[in-house]
């Protein structure tokens, strides 16, 4: 309750130190960041330019935060010290390690903030602010998107130019993160490029950091590709995971659990995450609808998914059928982000539509 009562002071500090590359806020969620990431890469492909991006991820970002580094950053950026004092006092509470009934002496942690606490995301942003400001100022032409601890840095243009500038920016970013006592993951950090040659060159240049490049990759839980060929590997994996849950869903249905509600509130949202970027093809959409119908009806095999999913809706506002989201999301996001009141993509759209550049358009 103490944290919640004082949250407005922290929100005010966030507003005073807002940056265009920071996401995870009002109307700037992961879905918006993912859409814009894919839009930049796709526009470069439509304009027949080389494109590449690095996705830098941190190892245990919250657990590796140095309390001394956090204090130094708080003094630099005028963060409310009384709020930081309470946070650090909570993080540094004495604790014991227990294993097989044996307790250790009291241990006091000198690094780490609790993920999920009221101010944890803001404190991580506070620690990253100086490094990200430096990259944004040194490479203003490179789109930068930061969602909590996921950093996306892209470059477009001639192949050699892309290779040179993206390598330099990524190396500087990694160096600055390491200076802040944060560790860059060499297993989760990856890159995407528009050609095999660019993948090879960037992979060699950034091999020291363990960043490998491919024509498509996963970013913020969705598929991203640097070519005009759509990537749906994450989408296919989620469909396989849903099929693997058939026995569990059947047991829930036998226990009189409203499985249709589970599909409306959970399964469909998980399956269609990223559909606003790559859409859903006819065949996988039909497979999704059949799995949803099977989960909602006791014996849906051989029945029409249209009828089963229609009957599963308990009201006019319910949309158990995943076809609703699959059709509405791509069009809805394009209209919302690029419309006159959309906001975040408006400037980007006008820049892309300037003379000499290819006009961006959604995927067919």
What kind of feature is each model-predicted range?
Residues 1-364:
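Nucleic-acid-interacting cores, centered on viral/eukaryotic replication and modification enzymes
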């Amino acid at each position: 309750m103490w944290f919640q009562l004082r949250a407005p002071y922290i929100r005010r500090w966030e507003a005073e130190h807002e940056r265009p590359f920071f996401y995870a806020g009002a109307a700037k969620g992961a879905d918006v960041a993912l859409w814009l990431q894919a839009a930049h890469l796709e526009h470069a492909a439509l304009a027949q330019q080389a494109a590449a991006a690095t996705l830098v991820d941190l190892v245990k970002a919250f657990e590796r935060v140095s309390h001394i580094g956090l204090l130094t950053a708080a003094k630099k950026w005028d963060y409310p010290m009384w709020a930081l004092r309470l946070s650090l006092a909570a993080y540094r509470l004495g604790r014991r390690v227990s294993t097989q009934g044996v307790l250790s002496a009291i241990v006091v942690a000198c690094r780490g903030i609790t993920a999920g606490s009221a101010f944890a995301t803001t404190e991580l942003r506070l620690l990253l602010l100086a490094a990200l400001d430096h990259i944004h100022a040194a490479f203003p032409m490179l789109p930068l998107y930061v969602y909590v601890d996921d950093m996306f840095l892209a470059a477009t243009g001639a192949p050699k130019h892309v290779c040179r500038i993206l390598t330099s920016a990524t190396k500087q970013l990694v160096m600055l993160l390491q200076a802040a006592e944060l560790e860059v993951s060499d297993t989760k950090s990856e890159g995407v490029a528009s050609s095999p040659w660019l993948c090879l060159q960037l992979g060699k240049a950034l091999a020291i950091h363990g960043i490998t490049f491919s024509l498509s990759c996963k970013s913020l839980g969705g598929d991203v590709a640097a070519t005009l060929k759509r990537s749906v590997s994450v989408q296919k994996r989620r469909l396989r995971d849903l099929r693997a849950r058939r026995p569990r869903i059947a047991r829930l249905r036998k226990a009189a659990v409203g499985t249709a509600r589970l599909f409306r509130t959970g399964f469909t949202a998980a399956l269609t995450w990223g559909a606003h970027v790559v859409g859903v093809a006819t065949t996988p959409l039909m497979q999704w609808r059949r799995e949803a119908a099977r989960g909602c009806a006791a014996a849906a095999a051989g029945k029409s998914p249209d009828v089963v999913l229609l009957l599963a809706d308990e009201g006019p506002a319910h949309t158990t059928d995943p076809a609703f989201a699959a059709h509405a999301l791509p069009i809805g996001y394009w209209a919302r982000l690029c419309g006159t009141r959309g906001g975040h993509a408006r400037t980007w759209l006008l820049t892309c539509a300037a003379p000499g550049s290819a006009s961006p358009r959604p995927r067919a």
